Design a protein with these regions (language model features):
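Basic, Lys/Arg- and aromatic-enriched nucleic-acid-binding interface segment
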Residues: 1-26
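C-terminal catalytic core of tyrosine-transesterase DNA break-rejoin enzymes
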Residues: 17, 21, 123-145
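Residue-level marker of regulatory loop/turn positions in helix-turn-helix DNA-binding domains and
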Residues: 7-8, 18, 59, 97, ...
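Short, leucine-enriched amphipathic alpha-helices that occur as contiguous helical runs
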Residues: 11-13, 98, 102, 123-124, ...
Length: 177
């Protein structure tokens, strides 16, 4: 996502990128702390997720550069709150709420003409892409699912019957049937 300060700020860009890079759940992103950040490894470590699982939240180099920029802004503005995402309210910086995170992502959706755009929309999309390019196991690993059954049932876009038929025709032709 390119810089456009008129429509969104660095925390918007970081939220979008982290959801896209990691396919993390909102509860994980919401709970990120500065102390969990490992810039050398491009991840947040020991993040509590759904059902108490501890996971790593990965990110890539573009996001790493945004994080460095955000850390400088935090230092300049003397933001000492332990949470990575913060809002300024009533004269102090506080942990950004899940609702604020949802609203920020929804705002990005409106910019690109998608009305029902939420953090989970990004999660489902990237899991679908990875599962289609790689395989269902890759999608399950990215999603931090216990097994690929959950990924298959709830995250993977199901193919249309015509697509399945065409794929079977191709496979049969390759097999000489």
């Amino acid at each position: 996502m390119k810089k456009n300060k008129k429509n969104y700020d660095i925390q918007d860009r970081l939220l979008f990128n982290l959801f896209l890079d990691s396919a993390a759940r909102i509860s994980a992103i919401y709970s990120l702390k500065i102390s969990q950040l490992n810039l050398d490894e491009n991840l947040f470590e020991n993040v509590r997720e759904k059902e108490g699982y501890i996971v790593s939240i990965i990110f890539f180099n573009e996001t790493k550069e945004l994080i460095k920029e955000w850390l400088k802004i935090r230092e300049t503005n003397k933001i000492t709150n332990e949470f990575f995402f913060v809002t300024y309210y009533d004269g102090t910086y506080k942990q950004m709420t899940k609702e604020t995170i949802r609203n920020r992502i929804k705002k990005i959706g409106k910019i690109i003409n998608i009305d029902d755009f939420y953090p989970h929309s990004i999660r489902k999309t990237i899991i679908n892409i990875i599962s289609n390019i790689g395989n269902i196991t890759d999608g399950a690993i990215l999603a931090n699912h216990k097994n690929s059954k959950v990924t298959s049932e709830h995250y993977i876009k199901h193919q249309k019957q015509n697509d399945i038929k065409n794929r079977l025709i191709d496979l049969r032709a390759k097999a000489g049937l």
